[in-house]
Amino acid sequence: MSGTVAQPEGITNPPIDELLEATDSKYSLVIYAAKRARQINAYYSQLGEGLLEYVGPLVETTSAQEKPLSIALREINSGLLTHETITDPLPPIS
């Protein structure tokens, strides 16, 4: 059987080690990617209504079925997104 093997997408591509270089920890990577994936999902939801409140994918999508989280991870790996780390802790609740 000859041919090409499909390139796996999602958490295996881009590699997790490359993604971790963009953030301080794996936990901040999860938050970072999840927030962007929600923005992409909202963009697609609003696309049919003509409301373009959110920015669409910044990388070329391989198919219409590609999941927003996979798109977000590829955007992070490409260096197309920036994030700010909040260093001030919240005040204690009294």
From Swiss-Prot:
Domain of life, source organism: Bacteria
Gene Ontology molecular function: DNA binding; DNA-directed RNA polymerase activity
Gene3D superfamilies, alphabetized: 3.90.940.10
Short name of any one Pfam family annotated for the protein: RNA_pol_Rpb6
Keywords: DNA-directed RNA polymerase, Nucleotidyltransferase, Transcription, Transferase
Catalytically driven reaction(s): RNA(n) + a ribonucleoside 5'-triphosphate = RNA(n+1) + diphosphate
Entry keyword annotation includes Membrane: no
GO cellular component, one term: DNA-directed RNA polymerase complex
EC numbers for this chain: 2.7.7.6
GO biological process, one term: DNA-templated transcription
Enzyme class: transferase
InterPro entries tied to this protein: DNA-dir_RNA_pol_omega, Pol_omega/Rpo6/RPB6, RPB6/omega-like_sf
Role description: Promotes RNA polymerase assembly. Latches the N- and C-terminal regions of the beta' subunit thereby facilitating its interaction with the beta and alpha subunits.
PANTHER family linked: DNA-DIRECTED RNA POLYMERASE SUBUNIT OMEGA
Family, per entry: Belongs to the RNA polymerase subunit omega family.
Subunit architecture: The RNAP catalytic core consists of 2 alpha, 1 beta, 1 beta' and 1 omega subunit. When a sigma factor is associated with the core the holoenzyme is formed, which can initiate transcription.
Protein name: DNA-directed RNA polymerase subunit omega
Organism: Parafrankia sp. (strain EAN1pec)
